[in-house]
Amino acid sequence: MHRAAVFLSVLVAALALVGGASAAVRVGVADDFGVDVLNGPWFLDQIGELGMTENRVSVGFDAASPTTIQNQAALDLYVPLATLRGVRLVFSVAPAKAKGITDTPGAAGLFAQYVALLARTYPTVKDFIIGNEPNQPRFWQPQFGRGGQNVSSGAYYELLAAAYDALKAVDPSINVIGLGLSPRGGDKPNAPNNVSTSPVRFLHGLGKAYRASGRSRPIMDELAFHPYPDQDRDPLLKGYRWPNAGVPNLDRVKQAFWDAFYGTAQPVFPEGTSSNGLKFRLDELGWQVDVLPSAAYAYFGLETVSPTNESAQAGIYADAVRYLACDASVNSVLFFLLRDEPNLERWQAGLVRADGSRRPSFDTVKSAIAESGGRCPGAMRAWRHSTRVAGAKVRWPRKLRLPARRLALALVLNAEEDARFEAGLYNARGKRVLRQAGSVDAYRSRIVRFSSRFRPGRYTFRVTLKAALNAGRRSSFSAPLRITR
């Protein structure tokens, strides 16, 4: 018998307590530090003192050894230990190489068998994140095909669908968590570096692949997302412009998912006060901070970013716990990491410094969890899907009463997402006499010019904008125009 199973009868009772959580948001860390047998007790002590209840750990997949559980000896010890401590474990399973799936024929099927093996080996683990930031070339390649079209979303779809079916066959109660999306992407196939895909466009591609497949069952129970700031000195609620998204832009991700999957067998995010539907697993969040001189001996290398300071991080982390608890679609929030990595070229956003000393954020997060219990301290925020183009506006000519002569009239169109437009001028009988059509880039004014010799009479401008990623969402505008003799 597998030695992890020795503890099974005891763990079932412990897991029932962990898994039976209320609607309160769970707070935890994404960190593998505790998996090491020498670190486990200290690591779990810190989590317990913080009041955290969830730990995401990474489990690699090697297509060359698809039946070998990576780091199994350490996991065999850590899984029962963490569960007995009341910590809910989440396995984040991803290919070890960026081309680990796409370069190996049949790799998606091998991956599905691998996650099923993990589920059978560790039956107390009920949460599996499939992949990690597949919209980033560091973790998934290629992102684009030779013609510039996105291909990563379609390839990832095959992986996720296969993993979903394999895990549900082992245990239907397993939470299959999709994506682990990065908050940003450039959408530029010919970029000199970081050839990445924005989260909104990745979801669009994923939905296209799903619909084209004819699948009649879901592919995920939750959506993992990493709402990092654009810059470490950004405040919590600065966020991003479309098509990227951060903490204050979760509604943008919900809308993108609705656009991609509404009307299919894949549930979308709940609307209004409903709690039924897809949920977020915000499994990586962090603001990197500078290193205090007193702890510098524990680090090496050169800093590669412009970090914030410890005081700012402490406030942001506590505010994040409270703010995200007021979104009913958020199941858990995981800080990345608990303890800094000593190499300054890597990650220093922990609640604990590399020397083991605690940052101010340790105490502020501990207090926020204790005070709120993971529940909203104020009013819950409600989301509803939109049927309109985000930020759509039309600026009409300054004068809408003009003398008859050859005129050049200009409209200015704006939107906060990419859109297509059709603009026309109609006479009093409703007949279109002029037409223009084209595209509007997000946050950039599009000037639409009409040039003609107009006859005296009454006319109407009509403009319709359609969202580029969902033509069913549209915004329409009209304005009168009078041409005098």
Regions found by a protein language model. Give the residues of each.
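Bacterial N-terminal signal peptides
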Residues: F7-A16
